[in-house]
Amino acid sequence: MKDFIFRILAKLYPMNLIEKLAYYKYVIQSYRISSRLGACGKGTRFSKVDYLTGHQHIHVGQNTIFLPHLFLTAWGEHDDSIKISIGDYCSIGAYCHISAYNKVSIGNHVLIGKWVSIVDNDHGETNKESLMIPPLERKLVSKGPIVIGNHVWIGDKVTILSGVTIGNNSVIAANSVITKDVPPFSVVAGNPGKVIKVYE
């Protein structure tokens, strides 16, 4: 009986129709998100965004793809300043979290894996007075902007912290924690991340 019902449903809703409906839903959802941003280039597509705040402070280039379950948070004043800038032809993996209080700048042709955190801020200073305040009530602080150059490949589950610049054409291995600047043409791995190879 169950097989019979599935056969009927398959005829009523052929795969090409389901795929078309899914595609149109994707396009509409993507337009709804991109139209809220400070700027967004042609051909950029968003899948499901779980959390978006400070959208007016977020600028994205053209032909960049965002995979599902994205967290984009730009904390700032009610002005037109750019807090998160993402270039052209980038791919942002599923479950990524990009958060800027100072600024996060990502170049062109950057590939970012799944479960990556790029966060330039913390909840308060690490002194006794701050630690006595509930974390959510502490003022956000940043040690500096995060700058990621062009043609950078960032593996799954990487964490990039504030005040870091990653040079062009670098590779960040999966599970790395980046706390210091990365020179161009470098391969970095580990926690904390260390340069294991530089291509001259």
Q: Positions of the model-derived regions?
A:
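Domain-scale signature associated with acetyltransferase and cell-envelope carbohydrate enzymes
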Residues: 1-120, 145-151, 184, 193-200
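Glycine-rich hexapeptide-repeat left-handed beta-helix
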Residues: 106-200
